[in-house]
């Protein structure tokens, strides 16, 4: 059997692109509507008040305010606390 596979052939050359997942805005940070809060695969964090979920499970702000992480029914949830008419 050949120990070399042949001309212009390789078994290497594969690498996946980084996915840049994780929490992008942490608790207490102020966000605007549309800002991404968490990039994730699956619902590690669930959307709460003022937070939407994209088709790839990305959580984003639906309104301006401060990010708040908490729990509801044994699930980790992300809420937006709207600032009281400070603007």
Swiss-Prot record:
The keyword Transferase does not apply. PROSITE patterns: RIBOSOMAL_L27. Keywords: Ribonucleoprotein, Ribosomal protein. Gene3D superfamilies: 2.40.50.100. GO terms for biological process: translation. Pfam families: Ribosomal_L27. InterPro entries: Ribosomal_bL27, Ribosomal_bL27_CS. PANTHER family: LARGE RIBOSOMAL SUBUNIT PROTEIN BL27M (PTHR15893:SF0), RIBOSOMAL PROTEIN L27 (PTHR15893). This is Large ribosomal subunit protein bL27. It comes from Renibacterium salmoninarum (strain ATCC 33209 / DSM 20767 / JCM 11484 / NBRC 15589 / NCIMB 2235). The lineage of its organism: Bacteria, Bacillati, Actinomycetota, Actinomycetes, Micrococcales. The gene is rpmA.
């Amino acid at each position: 059997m050949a120990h070399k596979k042949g001309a212009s052939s390789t078994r290497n050359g594969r690498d996946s692109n980084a996915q840049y997942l994780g929490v992008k805005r942490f608790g207490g940070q102020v966000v605007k509507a549309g800002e991404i809060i968490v990039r994730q695969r699956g619902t590690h964090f669930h959307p709460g008040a003022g937070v939407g979920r994209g088709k790839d499970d990305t959580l984003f702000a639906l309104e301006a305010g401060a990010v708040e992480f908490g729990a509801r029914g044994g699930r980790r949830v992300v809420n937006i606390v709207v600032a009281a008419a400070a603007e």
